[in-house]
Amino acid sequence: MALLFLFPVLVAPGPAPPSLARAILSSSTPLDLGFRQMYNLQFEEAHRSFSEWEQLHPDDPLGPASDAAAYLFSELERLGVLRWKLFLDDEKFKQARRLAPDPATRQAFDKALARSEQVADGVLARSPQDGNALLAKIMDLGLRSDYLALIEKRYLASLGYTKRAGILAEKLLAIDPSYYDAYLAVGIENYILGLKPAPVRWLLRIYGAQTDKDQGIDRLRLTAEKGHYLRPFAQLLLAVAALRDKDQNQARELLAGLAREFPNNTLYQRELDRLQSAQK
Protein backbone atom coordinates (compact mmCIF):
# COMPACT_ATOMS: atom_id res chain seq x y z
CA MET A 1 0.00 0.00 0.00
CA ALA A 2 1.18 3.45 -0.84
CA LEU A 3 -0.62 6.21 -2.62
CA LEU A 4 -0.75 6.96 -5.46
CA PHE A 5 -10.44 2.16 -16.94
CA LEU A 6 -13.45 1.67 -16.84
CA PHE A 7 -15.00 -0.70 -14.35
CA PRO A 8 -18.66 -0.52 -15.32
CA VAL A 9 -19.15 -4.06 -14.07
CA LEU A 10 -18.03 -2.97 -10.60
CA VAL A 11 -20.18 0.11 -10.35
CA ALA A 12 -23.31 -0.89 -12.24
CA PRO A 13 -26.50 -1.42 -10.23
CA GLY A 14 -27.48 -4.94 -9.32
CA PRO A 15 -25.54 -7.96 -8.05
CA ALA A 16 -21.89 -8.49 -8.90
CA PRO A 17 -21.14 -10.92 -11.73
CA PRO A 18 -19.91 -14.39 -10.73
CA SER A 19 -16.28 -13.65 -11.61
CA LEU A 20 -16.17 -10.74 -9.17
CA ALA A 21 -18.59 -11.86 -6.48
CA ARG A 22 -15.88 -13.62 -4.51
CA ALA A 23 -13.67 -10.54 -4.56
CA ILE A 24 -16.14 -8.22 -2.88
CA LEU A 25 -15.74 -7.90 0.88
CA SER A 26 -18.55 -9.47 2.87
CA SER A 27 -19.27 -9.55 6.58
CA SER A 28 -18.89 -13.32 6.80
CA THR A 29 -15.64 -13.19 8.81
CA PRO A 30 -14.30 -10.67 11.32
CA LEU A 31 -11.39 -9.99 8.94
CA ASP A 32 -13.67 -9.12 6.01
CA LEU A 33 -15.96 -7.13 8.28
CA GLY A 34 -13.00 -5.20 9.68
CA PHE A 35 -11.91 -4.12 6.22
CA ARG A 36 -15.44 -3.03 5.34
CA GLN A 37 -15.56 -0.99 8.55
CA MET A 38 -12.14 0.53 7.90
CA TYR A 39 -13.07 1.64 4.38
CA ASN A 40 -16.26 3.09 5.90
CA LEU A 41 -14.13 5.10 8.37
CA GLN A 42 -15.55 3.10 11.31
CA PHE A 43 -12.15 2.65 12.88
CA GLU A 44 -13.08 1.59 16.42
CA GLU A 45 -15.37 -1.09 15.03
CA ALA A 46 -12.62 -2.21 12.64
CA HIS A 47 -10.13 -2.59 15.50
CA ARG A 48 -12.62 -4.76 17.39
CA SER A 49 -13.18 -6.96 14.34
CA PHE A 50 -9.46 -7.35 13.66
CA SER A 51 -8.83 -8.10 17.34
CA GLU A 52 -11.50 -10.80 17.23
CA TRP A 53 -9.88 -12.35 14.16
CA GLU A 54 -6.46 -12.22 15.80
CA GLN A 55 -7.78 -14.02 18.87
CA LEU A 56 -9.47 -16.68 16.74
CA HIS A 57 -6.44 -17.09 14.44
CA PRO A 58 -3.27 -16.21 16.38
CA ASP A 59 -1.12 -17.83 13.67
CA ASP A 60 -2.46 -15.59 10.89
CA PRO A 61 -0.27 -12.47 10.46
CA LEU A 62 -2.98 -10.77 8.38
CA GLY A 63 -4.91 -10.02 11.57
CA PRO A 64 -2.37 -7.65 13.15
CA ALA A 65 -1.32 -6.32 9.72
CA SER A 66 -4.93 -5.31 9.11
CA ASP A 67 -5.13 -3.74 12.56
CA ALA A 68 -2.05 -1.67 11.69
CA ALA A 69 -3.77 -0.56 8.48
CA ALA A 70 -6.75 0.69 10.50
CA TYR A 71 -4.43 2.74 12.73
CA LEU A 72 -2.77 4.29 9.68
CA PHE A 73 -6.04 5.05 7.89
CA SER A 74 -7.52 6.61 11.04
CA GLU A 75 -4.47 8.84 11.42
CA LEU A 76 -4.58 9.88 7.76
CA GLU A 77 -8.24 10.77 8.18
CA ARG A 78 -7.65 12.68 11.43
CA LEU A 79 -4.80 14.69 9.92
CA GLY A 80 -6.72 15.47 6.76
CA VAL A 81 -4.18 13.76 4.53
CA LEU A 82 -6.85 12.07 2.43
CA ARG A 83 -7.67 15.17 0.48
CA TRP A 84 -7.87 14.94 -3.27
CA LYS A 85 -6.35 18.30 -4.08
CA LEU A 86 -3.17 17.37 -2.24
CA PHE A 87 -2.80 14.10 -4.12
CA LEU A 88 -3.48 15.79 -7.45
CA ASP A 89 -1.00 18.63 -6.87
CA ASP A 90 2.48 17.28 -6.11
CA GLU A 91 3.94 20.66 -5.17
CA LYS A 92 1.05 21.47 -2.85
CA PHE A 93 1.46 18.07 -1.19
CA LYS A 94 5.21 18.57 -0.69
CA GLN A 95 4.73 22.08 0.69
CA ALA A 96 1.85 21.17 3.02
CA ARG A 97 2.32 21.98 6.68
CA ARG A 98 4.28 19.56 8.81
CA LEU A 99 1.89 17.12 10.44
CA ALA A 100 1.60 16.37 14.15
CA PRO A 101 1.01 12.62 14.47
CA ASP A 102 -0.59 11.20 17.59
CA PRO A 103 2.08 9.36 19.66
CA ALA A 104 -0.40 6.81 21.05
CA THR A 105 -1.62 5.92 17.56
CA ARG A 106 1.95 5.61 16.32
CA GLN A 107 2.79 3.30 19.21
CA ALA A 108 -0.26 1.11 18.54
CA PHE A 109 0.58 1.09 14.82
CA ASP A 110 4.15 -0.05 15.50
CA LYS A 111 3.01 -2.72 17.96
CA ALA A 112 0.52 -4.16 15.47
CA LEU A 113 3.19 -4.26 12.76
CA ALA A 114 5.63 -5.93 15.15
CA ARG A 115 3.06 -8.62 15.97
CA SER A 116 2.36 -9.22 12.29
CA GLU A 117 6.05 -9.41 11.39
CA GLN A 118 6.79 -11.80 14.25
CA VAL A 119 3.97 -14.17 13.30
CA ALA A 120 4.76 -13.94 9.57
CA ASP A 121 8.45 -14.66 10.13
CA GLY A 122 7.56 -17.70 12.22
CA VAL A 123 5.23 -19.04 9.54
CA LEU A 124 7.77 -18.42 6.76
CA ALA A 125 10.50 -20.15 8.76
CA ARG A 126 8.37 -23.30 8.62
CA SER A 127 6.81 -22.74 5.20
CA PRO A 128 8.76 -20.26 3.03
CA GLN A 129 6.05 -20.14 0.35
CA ASP A 130 3.06 -19.50 2.62
CA GLY A 131 0.89 -17.04 0.70
CA ASN A 132 -0.85 -15.39 3.66
CA ALA A 133 2.43 -14.78 5.46
CA LEU A 134 4.02 -13.26 2.35
CA LEU A 135 0.97 -11.06 1.78
CA ALA A 136 1.13 -9.90 5.39
CA LYS A 137 4.82 -9.00 4.97
CA ILE A 138 3.95 -7.05 1.81
CA MET A 139 1.25 -5.15 3.69
CA ASP A 140 3.60 -4.47 6.62
CA LEU A 141 6.21 -2.95 4.31
CA GLY A 142 3.60 -0.94 2.43
CA LEU A 143 2.14 0.46 5.65
CA ARG A 144 5.57 1.52 6.89
CA SER A 145 6.20 3.18 3.52
CA ASP A 146 2.88 5.04 3.71
CA TYR A 147 3.53 6.32 7.23
CA LEU A 148 6.98 7.60 6.30
CA ALA A 149 5.81 9.30 3.11
CA LEU A 150 2.37 10.62 4.00
CA ILE A 151 2.84 11.58 7.65
CA GLU A 152 6.57 12.04 8.24
CA LYS A 153 7.33 13.13 4.64
CA ARG A 154 10.49 11.00 4.58
CA TYR A 155 10.24 10.12 0.92
CA LEU A 156 13.60 8.42 0.36
CA ALA A 157 13.16 6.21 3.41
CA SER A 158 9.66 5.40 2.19
CA LEU A 159 10.99 4.35 -1.22
CA GLY A 160 13.12 1.65 0.38
CA TYR A 161 10.07 -0.02 1.92
CA THR A 162 8.12 0.37 -1.32
CA LYS A 163 10.89 -1.41 -3.22
CA ARG A 164 11.06 -4.26 -0.69
CA ALA A 165 7.29 -4.69 -0.85
CA GLY A 166 7.46 -4.88 -4.64
CA ILE A 167 10.15 -7.56 -4.54
CA LEU A 168 8.12 -9.68 -2.10
CA ALA A 169 5.00 -9.18 -4.21
CA GLU A 170 6.79 -10.47 -7.30
CA LYS A 171 7.91 -13.49 -5.28
CA LEU A 172 4.38 -14.21 -4.07
CA LEU A 173 2.89 -13.81 -7.54
CA ALA A 174 5.49 -16.18 -8.98
CA ILE A 175 4.31 -18.76 -6.42
CA ASP A 176 0.59 -18.06 -6.86
CA PRO A 177 -0.61 -15.48 -9.43
CA SER A 178 -4.11 -15.59 -7.90
CA TYR A 179 -3.02 -13.42 -4.93
CA TYR A 180 -4.43 -10.40 -6.71
CA ASP A 181 -4.00 -8.09 -3.71
CA ALA A 182 -0.23 -8.41 -4.22
CA TYR A 183 -0.38 -6.74 -7.64
CA LEU A 184 -1.10 -3.47 -5.85
CA ALA A 185 2.43 -3.33 -4.38
CA VAL A 186 4.04 -3.76 -7.80
CA GLY A 187 1.57 -1.40 -9.42
CA ILE A 188 2.17 1.39 -6.92
CA GLU A 189 5.94 1.23 -7.41
CA ASN A 190 5.62 1.46 -11.19
CA TYR A 191 2.87 4.09 -11.25
CA ILE A 192 4.16 6.55 -8.66
CA LEU A 193 7.78 6.37 -9.80
CA GLY A 194 6.65 6.48 -13.42
CA LEU A 195 5.29 9.98 -12.76
CA LYS A 196 8.79 11.31 -12.05
CA PRO A 197 10.74 13.28 -14.70
CA ALA A 198 12.79 11.16 -17.12
CA PRO A 199 16.21 11.82 -15.49
CA VAL A 200 14.80 10.82 -12.11
CA ARG A 201 13.29 7.63 -13.56
CA TRP A 202 16.66 6.78 -15.11
CA LEU A 203 18.41 7.22 -11.77
CA LEU A 204 15.77 5.17 -9.95
CA ARG A 205 16.18 2.33 -12.45
CA ILE A 206 19.89 2.21 -11.63
CA TYR A 207 18.87 1.43 -8.06
CA GLY A 208 16.46 -1.26 -9.21
CA ALA A 209 13.17 0.62 -9.01
CA GLN A 210 10.38 -0.12 -11.49
CA THR A 211 9.19 3.07 -13.17
CA ASP A 212 6.69 2.11 -15.89
CA LYS A 213 3.54 4.17 -15.30
CA ASP A 214 1.35 2.25 -17.76
CA GLN A 215 2.41 -1.10 -16.33
CA GLY A 216 1.64 0.27 -12.88
CA ILE A 217 -1.90 1.12 -13.97
CA ASP A 218 -2.33 -2.38 -15.39
CA ARG A 219 -1.23 -3.95 -12.09
CA LEU A 220 -3.49 -1.68 -10.05
CA ARG A 221 -6.35 -2.64 -12.34
CA LEU A 222 -5.82 -6.33 -11.54
CA THR A 223 -6.21 -5.64 -7.82
CA ALA A 224 -9.18 -3.35 -8.45
CA GLU A 225 -10.94 -6.02 -10.51
CA LYS A 226 -9.97 -9.23 -8.73
CA GLY A 227 -8.42 -8.31 -5.40
CA HIS A 228 -10.07 -8.87 -2.05
CA TYR A 229 -8.92 -6.90 1.00
CA LEU A 230 -7.15 -4.23 -1.07
CA ARG A 231 -9.66 -4.06 -3.94
CA PRO A 232 -11.34 -0.82 -2.74
CA PHE A 233 -7.96 0.78 -2.07
CA ALA A 234 -6.82 -0.06 -5.61
CA GLN A 235 -10.02 1.47 -6.98
CA LEU A 236 -9.32 4.63 -5.00
CA LEU A 237 -5.81 4.82 -6.46
CA LEU A 238 -7.18 4.31 -9.96
CA ALA A 239 -9.65 7.14 -9.38
CA VAL A 240 -6.75 9.39 -8.35
CA ALA A 241 -4.85 8.30 -11.47
CA ALA A 242 -7.87 9.06 -13.65
CA LEU A 243 -8.19 12.54 -12.13
CA ARG A 244 -4.50 13.17 -12.75
CA ASP A 245 -5.04 12.21 -16.39
CA LYS A 246 -8.13 14.46 -16.63
CA ASP A 247 -10.35 11.43 -17.24
CA GLN A 248 -13.32 12.59 -15.22
CA ASN A 249 -15.73 10.00 -16.59
CA GLN A 250 -13.53 7.16 -15.43
CA ALA A 251 -12.97 8.75 -12.04
CA ARG A 252 -16.70 9.36 -11.65
CA GLU A 253 -17.58 5.72 -12.31
CA LEU A 254 -15.03 4.45 -9.81
CA LEU A 255 -16.07 6.95 -7.16
CA ALA A 256 -19.75 6.19 -7.64
CA GLY A 257 -19.11 2.52 -6.98
CA LEU A 258 -17.03 3.25 -3.89
CA ALA A 259 -19.62 5.71 -2.56
CA ARG A 260 -22.36 3.08 -2.88
CA GLU A 261 -20.29 0.35 -1.28
CA PHE A 262 -18.99 2.52 1.59
CA PRO A 263 -21.65 5.18 2.29
CA ASN A 264 -20.09 6.28 5.60
CA ASN A 265 -16.91 7.38 3.84
CA THR A 266 -17.71 10.91 2.72
CA LEU A 267 -14.41 11.20 0.83
CA TYR A 268 -15.87 9.43 -2.20
CA GLN A 269 -19.17 11.30 -2.31
CA ARG A 270 -17.51 14.66 -1.67
CA GLU A 271 -15.20 14.30 -4.66
CA LEU A 272 -18.04 12.88 -6.76
CA ASP A 273 -20.14 15.96 -5.96
CA ARG A 274 -17.22 18.20 -6.88
CA LEU A 275 -16.84 16.51 -10.26
CA GLN A 276 -20.54 16.80 -10.98
CA SER A 277 -20.57 20.48 -9.99
CA ALA A 278 -17.62 21.19 -12.27
CA GLN A 279 -19.59 19.86 -15.24
CA LYS A 280 -22.52 22.22 -14.73
Please identify what each model-predicted range represents:
Residues 1-12:
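Bacterial N-terminal signal peptides
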Residues 10-22, 279-280:
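Compositionally biased, proline/threonine/alanine/serine-rich low-complexity intrinsically disordered stretches
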Residues 17-50, 59, 70-129, 136-178, ...:
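Short coil/linker segments at helix-helix boundaries
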Residues 56-60, 127, 175-176, 228-229, ...:
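Short solvent-exposed coil/turn linkers within tandem alpha-helical repeat scaffolds
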Residues 63, 133, 182, 233-234, ...:
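TPR alpha-solenoid repeat register
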Residues 218-228, 232-237, 241, 245-255:
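Flexible, glycine-rich surface segments
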Residues 240-280:
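A cross-kingdom marker for long, charged
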